[in-house]
Amino acid sequence: PESHIARLLRDQLDLAHGRWLWSEAAKERWRLRDHEANTPVKKLKRIVKKATCLPLANPAGLALLERAEHLASSRLAKSDADANLFRDLNPALVFNGSHVHSRNATQAVHAAKALGIPTATFLFSWDNLTSQGRIIPLYDYYLVWNEQIREQLLEIYPAIRSEQVFVTKASIIC
């Protein structure tokens, strides 16, 4: 389980990212979420979420939300299981082999970062940056298919430096 505050900040970060990026895929996700808000309570929540994300749908706002989400995830963690496992194993690197946008690895990546263990992930497809939402949390290293994806990653995420991104060609990770 994770902190409700961390989850709320992560949702707002993802929503603000989509609104800032405003790709066709982001517009479609926005439309689908509007459609899913099919009760008065859900509609009100959706309106509040959209209204609060709009002022943050810019690079400075996204950076602020990233810092807040990181602090909330790190300081309000409800379990030390990942951190304890990493202390026992003492890995040189924590690699997220699941989808980069999957929330399955979020707590483990935050725990690794808190312990100073480098993190890495792979972008599985050319459209992951524009159709799947925000990468949360940010990693220390990224493996990408080609130079175009590398450049797009660096453009969308100004906090990522070029030396953190490695072009590996298309890969299948088992």
Give the positions of each predicted feature.
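Conserved N-terminal ligand/cofactor-binding loop architecture of enzyme catalytic domains
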Residues: 1-83, 88
